[in-house]
Each structure stands twice: as structure tokens, then as C-alpha cells.
Design a protein with these regions (language model features):
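N-terminal nicking endonuclease/strand-transfer module with a His-rich metal-binding environment
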Residues: 1-251
Length: 251
């Protein structure tokens, strides 16, 4: 069992010792166990669109093929959890390591002037990664309209759990879309990996982050699925098995 898995297990044990059934307040929805809810956890190494996620696209683009599925009248109901400039996150997490690296360079042409731009050109590193998390589907939300708020609340809880359990996956943007057929979470993170003996000692690398935490991408995915299953059970339902969760192995 890896260090990360042990920490997650310890956290779960502590929660089980003290947790009484949580009330979802105005967003509480309790299903009969016969109801099954599909969950989805997807990611890829492709570039993201923060303007799409934050709904800051220009008016002419709102009706193009990439945005026609959005109900713009409901966009004000979207829930912004985190919204930070990615360059700010880079400065905060890698700035000191870059400064230390530059101080050791005898030639100024070897110094790194802009680490963010350097990473963008480096195929061995990960500028960022986006996760998309969802409960239910369009049919379920139409059959049980109250589930939209309940799913949003569970997505907030998932994002908070993720932030606490994976502190070196720095969330710089997270928003729950309520203006589409099914509520879902877009969460963008920057992986912070340490342990490099040469060059810059901290770098954005998922493969190195996995190595630091003694897990692989499959185990990481299983942790997410287990948490989503737990959140489904909190609503008195069971997770619907609809196939494998999409996960693209980090490069």
C-alpha cells in the first residue's frame, strides 16, 4: 500500500468514527436504493478552454457548435469554486525553485526567464490537466428535477475532498456547470512534483507526481471512483455501472 493510499485510508477511518448522516439542507435528495446513478470521471492531456469553462466567451461564439448545448439563461447558476490565473499558481509553486536554479547559473543565457512559457514548450512536462466529474445523466435529471441541486452539492464535496487529499495537485480553476443538461464539474490542476536532483528541483509532472506518491494512474482513477461511489451512497442510491471511466495516461 502506497503512502498516499495509507493517508486516504486513515482519513476515511477518522471520518467513519465521527460521521453522522450528513444533511444536505435545501439540496437534500434521498433515493430508494433501487435507483442507480451513473458517475463519470474523465481527463486527458489535451489543452483546456478556461474561457469555455468560466463562460467568458465573446457573444459571437455563444451560438457556435461548441456552445450550442449551453442554456445561457441559466449560466448565472453556475458555481465557481476556484478561479485563479494559472501563471499565479506557477509563480507561487515554482518561483523559488526557478530562482535557486538561476542563481547557480554562471551564464545568464542559461537562466530561465519565464518558466511558464518554458513548460509550454517542454513535452516531458504537464502544463496542467483538466478533470471532468459528473453524477447522473439527462434522463435522471429530467425524471428527478431536484437532483440537479443535490448533484451540485455532492460535486462541491468531491472538489473539497480532492483538494485535501491531493494537496500537490494545485487547483487553479474549478466550476460546476448548471447550464447544461446534467450538472458536472470542470476542475483544472497543476501537478507539483519534487525530488529532481538536477536542474529545477520542482516541476509540473504527473508521471513524477505519481512516482512521488507510489501509485500509478490506474490506482489514482480507482480512488476517484471509490469517492464518487461513496457520495452516491450518501444520497441513498447505488452507482450504476456503465463501463470504464475514461482516463488518458499522463505523458
Amino acid at each position: 500500500m502506497s503512502k498516499l493510499q495509507k493517508r486516504l485510508l486513515l482519513t476515511k477511518v477518522k471520518q467513519n468514527r465521527t460521521l453522522s448522516l450528513e444533511h444536505l439542507f435545501s439540496r437534500e435528495v434521498k433515493f430508494n436504493m433501487a435507483v442507480s446513478i451513473a458517475t463519470s470521471f474523465r481527463t486527458s492531456a489535451k489543452s483546456t478552454s478556461i474561457s469555455h469553462n468560466n463562460r467568458t466567451v465573446n457573444d459571437p461564439l455563444k451560438n457556435d457548435k461548441y456552445h450550442k448545448h449551453i442554456d445561457w439563461d441559466k449560466t448565472d447558476k453556475n458555481i465557481i469554486l476556484v478561479q485563479r490565473p494559472i501563471k499565479e499558481v506557477y509563480d507561487e509553486n515554482f518561483g523559488e525553485a526557478v530562482t535557486q536554479y538561476n542563481a547557480k547559473q554562471k551564464r545568464t543565457d542559461r537562466q530561465v526567464k519565464n518558466y511558464f512559457e518554458k513548460v509550454k514548450k517542454d513535452k516531458t512536462l504537464d502544463l496542467q490537466r483538466e478533470f471532468i466529474v459528473q453524477f447522473g445523466d439527462k434522463g435522471l435529471c429530467e425524471e428527478y428535477p431536484d437532483t440537479r441541486e443535490a448533484f451540485a452539492f455532492q460535486l462541491e464535496k468531491y472538489a473539497d475532498w480532492f483538494r485535501q487529499q491531493f494537496p500537490d495537485l494545485k487547483i487553479y480553476n474549478a466550476v460546476i456547470h448548471m447550464d447544461e443538461a446534467t450538472p458536472h464539474l470542470h476542475m483544472n490542476v497543476v501537478p507539483v512534483a519534487t525530488g529532481y536532483k538536477q536542474g529545477i528541483t520542482k516541476r509540473p509532472s504527473f508521471s513524477k507526481w505519481f512516482k512521488n506518491n507510489e501509485i500509478d494512474f490506474k490506482q489514482f482513477r480507482e480512488m476517484q471512483v471509490e469517492k464518487l461511489d461513496e457520495l452516491v451512497q450518501e444520497m441513498g442510491a447505488v452507482r450504476k455501472i456503465v463501463g470504464t471511466h475514461e482516463y488518458e495516461k499522463p505523458s
